[in-house]
From Swiss-Prot:
Its main location: membrane. Aquaglyceroporin that may modulate the water content and osmolytes during anhydrobiosis. A motif (NPA 2) lies at residues 213-215. GO terms for cellular component: plasma membrane. It is found in: Cell membrane. A motif (NPA 1) lies at residues 76-78. Gene3D superfamilies: Glycerol uptake facilitator protein. Aquaporins contain two tandem repeats each containing three membrane-spanning domains and a pore-forming loop with the signature motif Asn-Pro-Ala (NPA). The gene is AQP9. The lineage of its organism: Eukaryota, Metazoa, Ecdysozoa, Tardigrada, Eutardigrada. One of its GO terms (biological process) is amine transport. This is Aquaporin-9.
C-alpha cells in the first residue's frame, strides 16, 4: 500500500513539495498555538506568562518536526527572508515558503475557530461578536488570534521591541542551524528552536506579545476581521499597531542576519568552513 501511494502521489516539482511541506508545518504550528491561546482565554490563564511560554515553544517545535527534512520548516517569513539574504536558500524558494507560511497560518486560524466555535459562542465571542462592545475594544478576545500591546506602550517602544525580539531570534536561529557553530543534531534541532522561542518570548513578550513572526500575527488578524470581529483588529490605536508585528520582524531579521554574518559567519577560518542546513542542493 505504501509503495503504491508513494509511486502514484509523488510530486516531481520541488517547489510544490516545499510549498506543501511548509504549509503543513505552519498549519501544525499555528493550530497548536492558537488552540493553546483559546484554551488560555477560556480557562482564565491568558495572563499566565509560563503557560504562554510553554505553548509557544512546543507549538513551533512540533511544527518544525513535521516538514523540517523536506522544506526546512522555517515557518517564519522574516527568518525565511534572512536566510535568503545570506544565500542559504534561493529567492524563488523564499517566495514559495513565505506564501505557504501565510496561507498555512490562515487555514489554521479558520480550523481553530471552527473547533472552538461553541466555546466562543458561550463566552460571547462567536460569529456575531464585535471587538467593540459597547464601545470598548475587547483585546482579551481579539488577542486569541493576534497580538496587541499594553495600553501604555508608545509606538516607538513597540517598534523597538519587535525589531529587537526578531533580531535575537535570528541570531539564535542562524547559530543553531550553522554547521560551523555548536549546532545540535538533526533530531534535536526543532527542540533547540523551540527553546530559543520560549526564551525570547519569556524575556520580552510582556508589553507587545512578541509575535516575532509576520504570518503568526497577520493571517489570524485577517481571519478575525473576516469572521466579523470588526475593523478594530486593524484600526486599533488609530492604525498605529497592526503593521508593527507584521513588518518590524522583517527589519529585525535582516539586521540579525547582517550582524551574525559580519561578526560570526564571515569570521570562520578556512578549516572551519561547512554548509548550512538550509543550503539549496
Amino acid at each position: 500500500m505504501g509503495a503504491f501511494v508513494n509511486t502514484k502521489v509523488y510530486i516531481e516539482n520541488k517547489n510544490i513539495r516545499d510549498w506543501l511541506s511548509e504549509a503543513l508545518s505552519m498549519f501544525m504550528y499555528m493550530s497548536l498555538l492558537l488552540g493553546s491561546a483559546a484554551t488560555g482565554h477560556f480557562s482564565g490563564r491568558e495572563d499566565d506568562a509560563l503557560f504562554g511560554v510553554i505553548f509557544q515553544g512546543f507549538s513551533i517545535t512540533f511544527g518544525i518536526y513535521i516538514g523540517g527534512a523536506m522544506s526546512g520548516a522555517i515557518i517564519n517569513p522574516a527568518l525565511t527572508l534572512a536566510v535568503a539574504l545570506l544565500g542559504k536558500i534561493s529567492w524563488r524558494k523564499c517566495i514559495v515558503l513565505q506564501s505557504a507560511q501565510y496561507i498555512g497560518s490562515f487555514i489554521a486560524s479558520a480550523v481553530v475557530y471552527l473547533i472552538y466555535n461553541d466555546s466562543l459562542d458561550a463566552f460571547g465571542a462567536g460569529a456575531n461578536f464585535t471587538a467593540t462592545e459597547p464601545g470598548v475594544f475587547r483585546k482579551d478576545v481579539a488577542g486569541i488570534w493576534s497580538t496587541f500591546p499594553k495600553t501604555y506602550l508608545k509606538e516607538r517602544g513597540a517598534i523597538f521591541n519587535q525589531i529587537f525580539c526578531s533580531m535575537l531570534l535570528t541570531f539564535g536561529f542562524l547559530a543553531i542551524s550553522d554547521y560551523k557553530n555548536f549546532r545540535p543534531s538533526k533530531g534535536l534541532f526543532p527542540i533547540a528552536v523551540g527553546l530559543l522561542v520560549m526564551t525570547v518570548f519569556l524575556a520580552f513578550s510582556y508589553s507587545t506579545g512578541a509575535a516575532m513572526n509576520p504570518a503568526r500575527d497577520f493571517s489570524p488578524r485577517l481571519w478575525s476581521l473576516i469572521i466579523g470581529y470588526g475593523i478594530e483588529v486593524f484600526s486599533y490605536n488609530q492604525y498605529e499597531w497592526f503593521w508593527i508585528p507584521w513588518l518590524m520582524p522583517y527589519v529585525g531579521a535582516m539586521l540579525g542576519a547582517l550582524i551574525y554574518q559580519l561578526l560570526i559567519g564571515a569570521q570562520w577560518s578556512k578549516g572551519q568552513k561547512g554548509e548550512s542546513k538550509h543550503k539549496d542542493p
